[in-house]
Amino acid sequence: MSKIIKPIKIFALLLFATLLLVIILITFLTIKSLPDYNRTVVNSLVKQDVKIFRNKYAIPNIVSKTNEDTFFALGYVHAQDRLWQMILLRKTAKGKLSEIFGEKYLESDKLIRTLDIYNNSRNSVKFLSKKTLNLLQSYSNGINKRLLDIKNQGLGRGAPTLF
């Protein structure tokens, strides 16, 4: 009987060790995928210091001296907290939800493409003032900075492939 118990104990110990390692790995990767709200971000496109404070609910408060820097920080913060939502809304405006979620979104995609929301939005840019375009560019620069940070901090995985 002890010949049977010893292999069972070894198997149980190996199973426990493997399970523990998997849990540690998943925890590590999950924690590393969350944004670090306490780090300093440096970018040459920011003209003056910008401070982003988060309250106990992680709601950001941006303090800066220029509108461009504020919009840069806003883009960065949005990409930190809402990147998935931003990508999903972009896919929605392009009428490409069925590429992600399957055939049940084909009718929705057809309607969106018929309304041509994406191209109409792109065409509306020519009616914006130079000041507004500069602010939107600052916002986009903030998003792109966050995407670059994700890529560089990807633990060798690179940027996440969302679709």
Regions found by a protein language model. Name each.
Residues T30-S33, Y37-S44, Q48-V50, Y57-F163:
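Flexible, non-catalytic peripheral segments of proteins
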Residues I4-V42:
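N-terminal type II signal-anchor transmembrane helix
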